[in-house]
Amino acid sequence: MKIDATDAVAALSELVDAGFTHDFRIQNGKLVDVSAGLAVNPAEVTVRMKLRFETEPGSGDASNIYALEIADTGVKGFLVDAL
């Protein structure tokens, strides 16, 4: 899979179009599928892609986007880490 986006919002749109529709977040130290309201076993997670978008080169302001897939269910989604 190839993402052609040049910013985080466009990248998320492309990921959703590619079937990565679930929103994952870190809550209380656990990975949670917010869309399903369930904690996810980290051993079941595969990172399919990692993207990084900086607001200005060298500024330290960046967004990391991880495209994730859960092995036992096939659920695909994304985790956004904004620095």
Model-identified regions with their sequence ranges:
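Polybasic/polar functional segments that serve as interface/processing modules
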Residues: M1-L83
